[in-house]
Amino acid sequence: MSVSITKKFYKLDINRTEWEIPDIYQDLQPVGSGAYGQVSKAVVRGTNMHVAIKKLARPFQSAVHAKRTYRELRLLKHMDHENVIGLLDIFHPHPANGSLENFQQVYLVTHLMDADLNNIIRMQHLSDDHVQFLVYQILRGLKYIHSAGVIHRDLKPSNIAVNEDCELRILDFGLARPTENEMTGYVATRWYRAPEIMLNWMHYDQTVDIWSVGCIMAELITRRTLFPGTDHIHQLNLIMEMLGTPPAEFLKKISSESARSYIQSLPPMKGRSFKNVFKNANPLAIDLLEKMLELDAEKRITAEEALSHPYLEKYAEPSVEQTSPPYDHSFEDMDLPVDKWKELIYKEVTNFKPPPSYAQVLKDVK
């Protein structure tokens, strides 16, 4: 790991990628990488506070990349809820220069969480009380996200982070889209994906996230993936085996003729009893699962309704289950060249103000 110090920023090499970051962030250690960036953990100088820093990969490589960068930035800036990941800081090298020409990199700083639900499921058996608390926090975060007019669309155990106090945050908004837009294509990991996305219905709503929560909750209870499909068809078959083949009135709602024909070609299936599948589970947990894993999205429970379900009564506190101001997604309809997206991103970065508590940390460090 090579390091060269400049006045405020310093450079270091992490996994053969050059990082250039403010010197208040020290002891960087890589924690993960993907198609859209690398993440390292860091210590805020002079404190014992740890943060996560994400270096966006090729943010201005194309108009598609740049729009995605803008989307992720806007969503993270909008979110202000203790169960949803939000931005602590944004930076780019050469801020003093103030030139768009030198604006080539974007780094996002967020809370560092100890583990994700994947780790938790693999490491330990969770008590019913633990499951209640985790599911409550997921739904509390989702109520906030949905009230902003946003669908997450990629909820899965690895996108839900937990710290040692069992406090939870929903992560990874890069793929989220506003609810009003029609959306297509591959998004969520198949195992947690609602059937209406898989069947390519154009008009789906926020309850696709509730289906995902149902799959996650089932996994928290049993420590096994509920619908581990090897492909779309296998996935759909597993769902039908569990829930039964849908009635004719439901089939009429499916806009995809091929999906409708396929379901009609299946032998009639009665479905399995949730009580038999989740043999030792709290009966109230089973009731909530049945309401979340409802094939008909119009009948599926919402996040707000689920929060008042008797299973979560111990933790329910409507006065702190806040909603969000509407998220402005008008830019989604914009088709701009890279340079224009870059200008918009630069404006968002330079206008950013850290949350008050973190602003105080930064002030004390300086």
Curated annotation (Swiss-Prot):
SMART domains according to UniProt: S_TKc
Active site: D154 (proton acceptor)
Gene Ontology biological process: cellular response to arsenic-containing substance; cellular response to cadmium ion; cellular response to reactive oxygen species; defense response to bacterium; defense response to fungus; determination of adult lifespan; heart morphogenesis; immune response
PROSITE patterns: MAPK (PS01351), PROTEIN_KINASE_ATP (PS00107), PROTEIN_KINASE_DOM (PS50011)
Reaction catalysed by this enzyme: L-seryl-[protein] + ATP = O-phospho-L-seryl-[protein] + ADP + H(+); L-threonyl-[protein] + ATP = O-phospho-L-threonyl-[protein] + ADP + H(+)
Binding site for ATP: V31, G32, S33, G34, A35, Y36, G37, Q38, V39, K54
Record-listed Phosphothreonine modification sites: T184
UniProt motif (TXY) ranges: 184-186
Any one cellular-component term (Gene Ontology): nucleus
Similarity remark: Belongs to the protein kinase superfamily. CMGC Ser/Thr protein kinase family. MAP kinase subfamily.
Name of the molecule in the record: Mitogen-activated protein kinase p38a
Species lineage: Eukaryota, Metazoa, Ecdysozoa, Arthropoda, Hexapoda
Gene encoding the protein: p38a
